[in-house]
Amino acid sequence: MFNRVVLFLLTNFAVLILAGIVMSVLGVNPTQMSGLLVMAAIFGFGGSFISLLLSKFMAKRSTGAQVITEPRTQTERWLVDTVRRQAQAAGIGMPEVAIYDGPEINAFATGANRNNALVAVSTGLLQHMREDEAEAVLGHEIAHIANGDMVTMALLQGVLNTFVIVLARVVGGIIDSALSGNRDSGRGFAYYIIVFVLEMVFGLFATMIAMWFSRRREFRADAGGAQLAGRNKMIAALERLSLNHGQNTLPSQVQAFGISGGVGEGLRRLFLSHPPLTERIAALRASNGTAM
């Protein structure tokens, strides 16, 4: 956690330096932009971290996940015992364990930190996966928590949000001034239209970057699951997913931390949070279960 806070501070500092350089190159007075930078950081990081802090509550509410407080069946007992054993092996606090009603084979992890997390599995997973395959899926989710992926994604999203807000307004101001022929003119309706369009365009590129990082993170979680449950079990779980790949019904806020993502070709692949299952299986076979 400490390393990620340091990374956050260094990244924030780098954002401010880069923004100042860009504004100087574009002929914008950086001293006039301090308010914009503060506003961008507040909105950019604020939204990401509020979502992170509320992630467990929102995930349980949006999926209808029922936390297992006292196991009532053999399956629930096995789930809790397996998560506890893997959490101890990964050096994290015991997450809450939940089951949500969903026909697809899926599971997800969420939470604000390594010691305050949630692991939930679908009823479809419990119905269609063997116990060894489900063990590997749980290991994958525990690896997400142990790697601090939720915090890292929140940091990255905050940086990207800040860039989008700042660049859209800086570039929008330059375009507006060029069109009006007056650098000192007030901001009119056209300026806000330009900024709105630029935020959508820059937001698409920011999403591509975030999803690229998310796909790399999935390979690491697969490797972590292989270490906790066994490489062959992890491969078998992914192969089972490839045979029973249905529509992902997880809410958008937890899809990135599910075991299974969407399917897409061409440009759509750039916006997927998960790599193709064939690539994940191939990476595991080539890695011998080592961390990636």
UniProtKB/Swiss-Prot annotation:
Its cofactor is Zn(2+). The chain crosses the membrane at residues 5-25, 35-55, 155-175, 193-213. One of its GO terms (cellular component) is plasma membrane. It is an enzyme of class 3 (hydrolase). Zn(2+) binds at residues 140, 144, 218. Disulfide bonds: none annotated. Keywords: Cell inner membrane, Cell membrane, Hydrolase, Membrane, Metal-binding, Metalloprotease, Protease, Stress response, Transmembrane, Transmembrane helix, Zinc. It is found in: Cell inner membrane. Binds 1 zinc ion per subunit. This is Protease HtpX. The lineage of its organism: Bacteria, Pseudomonadati, Pseudomonadota, Gammaproteobacteria, Lysobacterales. The gene is htpX.
